Amino acid sequence: TFGGNYSGYLGRKSQRLNQEQDISVYPNNPIGEGAKDRGERFQWTFPIVFSPHDTSVMYTTSQHVWRSTNEGMSWTRISGDLTRNDTTKQRASGGPITKDNTGVEVYNTIFTFAESPVAKGTLWAGSDCGLIHVSTDNGTTWTNVTPSGLPEAQISIIEASPFDAATAYAAVTRYKHGDDAPYLYRTTN
């Protein structure tokens, strides 16, 4: 069993042995630090995704996409920073006495991730700052495919089509910007 928690904590639990192991990409406790001071920026609910083509391949995301082929015993970074990396939105939050930097306020992260169930190595990443990237070569190169005119927003989910490798759907929200309208996008290329 695999599970994640705030600040990028990722654990693996053996039900048979009743043992838990930390398999975090960046095993650090950044509580109290602003996001710009962290080596990796993880969203409170960061993606943990297994490849539909090979269940020994696992992905997770910070501002980077990470891949493991050994149940998290080691990780390989397969992307650059796929966010806007706006450091003005990565400062410590909270008051002058108590800083509230537990992970939920971390911004400029990859919020959603998917691998095409049709084409092995076609990977989709969406950030909480409104960018969508795709790789068609297993993470070697990434292309920004953010819809033209999309303002800063949170890419809530990307769903790769189960029928066509070039098709994906994205649900986008801007509630943090005072905009409650729904945004839905589809690409076929």
Language model features with spans:
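Beta-propeller blade termini and top-face loops
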Residues: 1-189
